[in-house]
Amino acid sequence: MSYRGRGGGYNNNRGQFSSGPHQHQQNVDSFVAANQYPIEIMGWNGASSGECINFISRKCKVIVSNYSVDSNSGVLKGYVKNESQANTLLNWSGVKFAGQSLRFSKGVSNISNQMGGGASTGSQSTIETISQFLKARYQPEIKMLNLSNVKQDPTLTAQGFFGSLSVSSKFFPALMKVASDLKLDVDSIDLSNNELQDLQTLTSMAQTFPKLQNLSLQNNNFTKIKVFETWRHKLNFLRELILFNNPIVQTNDPAEIQTIKLELMKSFPRLVVLSGEILRNEQVLIANLSFPFESPETMFFQDEDSRNLATNFIANYLKLWDANRSELMILYQNESQFSMQVDSSHPHLIESGNSGYSGSTDFGYYLNNSRNLTRVSSIKARMAKLSIGQEQIYKSFQQLPKTRHDIIATPELFSMEVYKFPTLNGIMITLHGSFDEVAQPEVDGSASSAPSGPRGGSRYHSGPKHKRIPLSKKSFDRTFVVIPGPNGSMIVASDTLLIRPYTSDFPWKVQKLPSNPTAATPGVSATSTPSPLPPTTITTPQLAPPGTGPTTADLPADIKARLNQIQQELLVKILLETKLNINYGIMLCEQSNWDYQQASVNFKNSAASLPSDAFVQ
């Protein structure tokens, strides 16, 4: 039998591999060249950059490689294979991700290119032109930036900034980047008369001016309230918003008007004035949003015994956690439980002050074992991610990066609360702070989840190797339930670790709100505007001490059928203290995960924005 047709005979592969390293380099060059079409992504801040890239790969069937976050603009930048893939992503603009709408654009390497090249044909560069424009429009005496009617600005028009639709759409992102570099002190911005239909091009404004207090968007083309989701919980100091002469407010339906007000108050927690109308009591609002202690302490202990136990425990625990986690296993027993979850759902400021770390936060080492119950719905998956007993717990510890906690050198960066836990005759310790990742895990659990086979990489190992995940600073919250053991020892009955993006803004720091928020209305044009409705003041109900009222026996049968006894008792307690009706009471409990302390906090934060029919009349 001849094998001539199958392999060409002995040593017939000599010609195929004769080029050696030269051929290999050509392959590398070809791969690099094929993955160098830039793409930019906005509206991704509801989660981590890695989660966004994975979502795009699953949903859009396009792989974005070599991605990074621009620390100035917050834009997520990466590369796709060719222009065709870039066009595919452009067609996906508007797809929902982590509660926001993603927006794709063909990327660039600098602002001059971003403006399409045509914007720098004059003697001034693009950056210089935008800088001069900003300086001319900035009024430092009242801290106001006038960005109204930018398309009619003669300097910008002469430089070709609005010569095409693609260039026009990139103007505001470029402007915000330059404004960030100039570090303008801005309280008010006027964006009137700009033909705006949505806020996609203004996503980065929240990062550039996070403490903005007054904003005018009058004489634009906003038609839907959901466009403001782009800025939800990002402009947390916005006090006044002007929306005159927008289709969204040109309605006479009282229910629709009330819905608009409520949605805007949810998006901007300190919003007081909407188009001249007072929405809520500002003094009550400031009181509810202010930290209740004049000099907040980083540590709280229920008594002296709790202090002694907790401080010794935490100091020794973190020392071993950073040095040798195997020595911690003596603290865990067969019934001990450990779980870890990642919370990347809250937008966070991109901090560039961490030398030695990458600009973006990657949770790759944590996601595989994350037990975030808002994302893991399967009972089987939830149980699989709960470690019980020494063996499973140590295995979970090995899959987490090695760390360094500087609690001895910088105790002010940590906070701790300690309460007695009478159910088990122990104490509950909750520790908040941050840590440095200093080395990869002993066991890389993220690699085990890599797909294989025809749909997930080559089954013959010809695909790309597992990418090493960059290390970075991260913030955390960790709760221990510690009980006494034999011979004076201590046992960790429960250990819950929450990992979140790093921030240097700690809630136990003193953060004073402006005592006299400026009430100046940002740049209203001379055109006539409709007179505002008579102002109304919404008083905020306060938590009241429980008194005589309903009991669990008084709850409707259908409510009792779907709630356990503990939930029924909590619901009754909440109804008595908040005076909410039963529907809003259940909603509050569910959104607080049936936690009394969290429900109290959530009620105080949102009571001012609740309609009057939410309360028992």
From Swiss-Prot:
Q: Is Electron transport there in the keyword field? A: no
Alphabetically sorted, this entry's keywords are: Cytoplasm, Leucine-rich repeat, mRNA transport, Nucleus, Repeat, Transport
LRR repeat intervals: 185-206, 211-232, 237-258
Q: Where is the TAP-C domain?
A: 565-617
Segments forming domain NTF2: 309-499
InterPro entries for this protein: Leu-rich_rpt, LRR_dom_sf, Mex67_RRM, NTF2-like_dom_sf, NTF2_dom, Nuclear_transport_factor_2_euk, NXF_fam, TAP_C_dom
What is the first-listed, main subcellular location in coarse terms? Answer: nucleus
- Region of interest: Disordered: 1-24, 442-469, 513-554
Cellular location(s): Nucleus; Cytoplasm
Q: Single GO molecular-function term?
A: U5 snRNA binding
Query: Is Zinc-finger included in the keywords of this UniProt record?
Result: no
Bias (Gly residues): 1-10
Kindly state one GO CC term assigned in the UniProt record: nuclear RNA export factor complex
A Pfam family: TAP_C
Signal peptide residues are: none
Q: How does it assemble?
A: Interacts with nucleoporin complex protein MTR2.
Q: What is known of its domains?
A: The NTF2 domain heterodimerizes with MTR2. The formation of this heterodimer is essential for mRNA export and binds to all of the nucleoporin-FG-repeats.
Function noted in UniProt? Involved in the export of mRNA from the nucleus to the cytoplasm.
Family indicated by similarity: Belongs to the NXF family.
The protein depicted here goes by the name mRNA export factor MEX67
What is the protein's species of origin?
Candida albicans (strain SC5314 / ATCC MYA-2876)
Taxonomy of origin reads:
Eukaryota, Fungi, Dikarya, Ascomycota, Saccharomycotina
> Gene behind this chain?
MEX67
